[in-house]
Regions:
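Accessory carbohydrate-recognition regions in carbohydrate-active enzymes
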Residues: 1-336, 340-371, 375
């Protein structure tokens, strides 16, 4: 059977730097036009080059909304397993990794973290994701949730095996009430709870708000023990994040991986190419995958099944579609005609979102980052 997603290489274009781009990409593990992407993070917090192929350490697994390194990210937070000590600092918790121990697909990511002897796997839906951690035998296994800097909140709820929090990190131009609310549920009870604010870890303190906060939860693990984490987020509220978590349903990890693969194949199989060699197939479908990431969905489905969105223009929750993170002065030439041709029903939703942008801001965008409206006279 035709399996075009297996030609996609999300690592293509990641050997880039500020000085020299070979694509300025990161491995966006995502669904087509998903509200949230996930990426392994090799760069320091706030670095636009968040994953670089030549790096040898991973600092965390980050929910990201970044369209380019120049525009940078917003609402991001990171998750990282560690063993031994509850290290939360981004440098101290980082682990060596090798590309030989890494699998990157559009719909699935797996890596062996050598320093911690932990295998991390993740698979996303539009607004949620599931992690599968395989731990070694250790009295002190931990998972760090880093809500990052520029204003964040964290709360550990051990009786529900849950962590909630929000990030207000952004690149400017946001309404005062901007937050990315996240909810994380684990399938193993905690035997250790701590939160950190800035550079200080407080064991037993379950809630913190500061410039840079996060949480560390821990437990004893057996060799090969698997711990799952369900993650969802919302730009509207914690309650909406819990609704978005329902995208995962009762599916297990492997079922979600297969569903993600099926969705990508459904979209990518709209074009079947002939002739050429394997490298050309990989190039074509990797670029096709990149063409189906942005503009991303910035809308959510509420408890009544209605399409709603947090407006990055006036801070209100309003009905209707919203898409973002695309530079129209680049994408009007080819991307939008292509989407109109190949995915007219999705392009219609994007155009409705453009009308909503005009209603809420008074302008059509030229470079629409959800939180920044860039327009030139």
């Amino acid at each position: 059977s035709f399996d075009p997603v297996e030609y996609v290489n999300p690592l293509m274009g990641t050997q880039s730097s500020y000085e020299l781009s070979t694509g300025n990409t990161y491995p966006a593990i995502a669904r087509p036009w998903g509200m949230n992407f996930w990426t392994p993070q090799t760069g320091k917090m706030g670095d636009g080059w968040q994953y670089v192929y030549t790096a040898n350490k991973i600092r965390g697994f980050k929910q990201t909304h970044q369209p380019s390194p120049w525009i940078n990210d917003y609402g991001q937070f990171a998750i990282m397993p560690v063993v031994g000590k509850p290290e939360f600092d981004q440098d101290k918790r980082a682990s060596w990794f090798s590309h030989k121990g890494e699998i990157a697909k559009a719909y699935y990511y797996k890596v062996y973290l050598a320093e911690h002897d932990v295998v991390t796997e993740l698979t996303p839906t539009d607004r949620a994701a599931m992690f599968r951690f395989t731990f070694p035998e250790n009295e002190h296994s931990y998972i760090v949730v880093d809500a990052l800097d520029k204003g964040s909140y964290i709360k550990v709820i051990p009786e529900e095996n849950k962590i909630i929090g929000y990030s207000t990190k952004n690149s400017g131009g946001v309404p005062d009430n901007f937050k990315n609310y996240f909810v994380i549920e684990f399938d193993k009870p905690f035997t250790y709870e701590a939160t950190f604010a800035d550079a200080s870890l407080k064991e037993g303190t379950k809630e913190q708000t500061s410039d840079h906060v996060g949480a560390v939860i821990g437990f004893k693990t057996k060799k090969g023990e698997i711990v799952h984490a369900k993650v969802a987020s919302s730009f509207i509220s914690f309650d909406q994040a819990a609704i978005n978590m329902k995208e995962l349903g009762n599916d297990n990890f492997d079922t979600l991986v297969q569903k993600g693969k099926d969705v990508w194949n459904e979209h990518l199989s709209k074009i079947e190419v002939e002739g050429g060699d394997l490298d050309q197939y990989r190039t074509f479908y990797s670029c096709f995958y990149r063409s189906l990431l942005f503009p991303r969905k910035f809308y959510e489905i509420n408890a009544q099944g209605e399409v709603v969105h947090y407006s990055p223009y006036n801070g209100e929750v309003l009905p209707g579609y919203m898409f973002t993170d695309t530079g129209f002065w680049d994408t009007f030439r080819s991307l939008f005609p292509f989407l109109n041709l190949m995915f007219p029903s999705v392009n219609k939703e994007m155009q409705e979102g453009l009308i909503n942008t005009y209603k809420e801001s008074g302008f059509f965008p030229e470079w629409a980052l959800s939180l920044i409206h860039i327009s030139e006279p």
